[in-house]
A protein has these predicted regions:
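The feature encodes the CheY-like receiver
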Residues: 35, 77, 105
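Charged docking surfaces used in two-component/phosphorelay signaling
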Residues: 36-44
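Short hydrophobic/Thr-rich beta-strand motif most characteristic of the beta2 strand and flanking loop
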Residues: 46-53, 61
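Acidic catalytic/metal-coordinating carboxylates
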Residues: 53-57, 80-83
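Short amphipathic alpha-helix used as the core "switch/output" element in two-component signaling
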Residues: 60, 82-93, 111
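Active-site beta3 strand of CheY-like receiver
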Residues: 65-71
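C-terminal output helix
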Residues: 105-107, 121, 125-135
């Protein structure tokens, strides 16, 4: 008799068990089409999403939105994703940041990681890969009770 092995599948969005509040995500990308796609995908998974088109707009939204996680493009005008990451670390220490890029290089990934990015993903990012990283970042940040992660 052979055993059937089934992969563990995440339940879906992370919800804080104490407040029953959905995780708030701040998504930053200067490509309006991709920003809309990311927003649709994340809202479909029941996350609260604030979408902005620049790092400067993200910094302005940071105090108002009080996100649990930031997802940002690497290459943007005025301030890039690494600059945004460093500014976030100053203003909101401990806030996790996932960096996305269409033109990722090994030096970019090393710089992002050394600067404190939680994850560095290349575009086009697979939906499940993005969702997995979002869930991991939220759990590492202590947003959810990790004992309730799997059914």
């Amino acid at each position: 008799m052979s055993a059937i092995l089934r992969p563990l599948v995440p339940l879906g969005p992370v919800v804080n068990p104490q407040s029953k509040r959905k995780a708030r995500l701040l998504v930053v990308d200067d490509d309006p089409g991709l920003l809309r796609l990311l927003t649709i995908r994340l809202r479909a998974e029941n996350y609260e999403v604030e979408a902005v088109e620049s790092a400067l707009a993200a910094l302005a939204a940071l105090a108002r939105v009080r996100p649990d996680l930031v997802i940002t493009d690497l290459r943007m005008d005025q301030m890039d994703g690494i600059g945004l990451l460093k500014e976030i670390q100053t203003r909101a220490p401990g806030l996790r940041v996932i960096i996305l890029t269409a033109h990722g290089t090994i030096p970019d990934a090393v710089q992002a990681t050394q600067s404190g990015a939680f994850a560095f993903l290349t575009k086009p990012v697979e939906k499940q890969e993005l969702l997995d990283q979002v869930q991991k970042a939220l759990r590492v940040s202590g947003f959810a009770d990790t004992t309730e992660d799997w059914r």
